[in-house]
Curated annotation (Swiss-Prot):
Annotated catalytic residues: E200 (proton donor)
UniProt cofactor note: Binds 1 zinc ion per subunit.
Lineage, uppermost ranks: Bacteria, Pseudomonadati, Pseudomonadota, Gammaproteobacteria, Alteromonadales
Entry protein name: Adenosine deaminase
Keywords, sorted A to Z: Hydrolase, Metal-binding, Nucleotide metabolism, Zinc
Organism: Shewanella baltica (strain OS155 / ATCC BAA-1091)
InterPro entries reported for this sequence: A_deaminase, A_deaminase_dom, Ado/ade_deaminase, Metal_Hydrolase
Binding residue positions for Zn(2+): H12, H14, H197, D278
GO terms, molecular function: 2'-deoxyadenosine deaminase activity; adenosine deaminase activity; zinc ion binding
Length: 331
């Protein structure tokens, strides 16, 4: 099912959406933070999906517990380290971990730039202990507004040498992409790649805006593109990658069922698309789960799954030499 001769990658993976349940428990007790449960076992339903949520916003509330225990920069560093470990232990050869320093900092008023530094330090420590390639993507959390995103952007750009790209995430309907055009002009000026959450809660126009105005070369989720034939044609022609996260889309009620997921429609249209976990800690999944689902529920053949793996390597924010090195390591 997973072709071991092809690098296995996860490109849409939120670092702050992958905090271990036991880490939430331990950090909560260490810092005297009131948790919603009185045991590790009963904590899980508050931080992980049980079935599916009614909306993206309800899903995101699970994430609040994950960042709610980040009481100091050591906690941030620990979570970053464990993200590297989890990526390696799930069999990934390469992962792009994205994170929102404003979101991670806000509960305990941590310095935004300090959060970025702690994430970088935690990832570096993890890479000394685990055999996996990791790159970082900074997130601007649109839900907190333009001013907050300016603070976030400045904290991230201060460490731009440790990033490969910037992302726009959060409440797509309430805070449309055009509010952040100036932010992403600065991202382009910094020579960072751009991806954006779009076409998840909003329609195809959100994707057009992300591509044409923000400068996105990849789109997170993008499920609503299928209702716009011109956009589908554009995506295929220009090799705009779709970072697909089927289980997350089910959990957020973006799609009603796996059978309703448009993954097959994208593939049949020749759109570059790959499989990702999104918030693996919240969804309680790993990349292997997504490939199993793609075969059993999305009805992809082994040959198609191998193409999806190759797509992921092509879509990755890597140089050609780095891509070749990933393949060479599989021989």
């Amino acid at each position: 099912m997973i072709d071991t001769s092809i690098p296995l990658v996860d490109l849409h993976r939120h670092l702050d959406g992958n905090v271990r349940v036991n880490t939430i428990w331990e950090l909560g007790h260490q810092h005297g933070i009131a948790l919603p449960a009185d045991s590790l076992e009963t904590l899980a339903p508050f931080v992980q999906i049980q079935g599916k949520e009614t909306s993206l916003v309800a899903f995101l509330k699970k994430l609040d517990w994950m960042v709610g225990v980040l009481a100091d920069l050591d906690a941030v560093k620990r979570v970053a380290y464990e993200n590297v470990a989890d990526a390696a232990l799930s069999g990934l050869d390469y992962a792009e971990l994205r994170f929102s320093p404003y979101y991670m900092a806000m509960n305990h008023k941590l310095p935004i730039e300090g959060v970025v530094e702690a994430v970088v330090d935690g990832v570096k420590a993890g890479l000394k202990d685990y055999n996996v390639k990791i790159n970082l993507i900074g997130i601007l959390s649109r839900s907190f507004g333009q001013a907050a995103c300016t603070q976030e952007l400045e904290g991230l750009l201060a460490h731009k040498q440790h990033l490969v790209a910037m992302d726009l995430a959060g409440d797509e309907m309430g805070f449309p992409g055009e509010l952040f055009n100036e932010h992403f002009k600065r991202v382009r000026d910094a020579d960072l790649a751009i991806t954006a959450h779009a076409g998840e809660a909003a329609g195809s126009q959100s994707m057009w805006q992300a591509i044409q105005e923000l400068g996105a070369t990849r789109i997170g989720h993008g499920v609503n593109a299928i209702h716009d034939p011109k956009l589908m044609e554009y995506l295929a022609k220009h090799r705009i990658g779709i970072e697909s996260c089927p289980t997350s889309n089910l959990h957020t009620s973006t799609v009603a069922s796996y059978a309703d997921h448009p993954f097959r429609t994208f593939m049949d249209a020749g759109v570059l698309i790959n499989l990702n976990t999104d918030d693996p800690g919240v969804s309680a999944i790993d990349i292997n789960h997504e490939y199993r689902i793609a075969k059993s529920e999305l009805k992809l053949t082994d040959a198609e799954l191998a193409q999806v793996q190759r797509n992921g390597v092509e879509m990755a924010f890597l140089s050609d030499s780095e891509r070749k090195a990933l393949y060479a390591a599989k021989v």
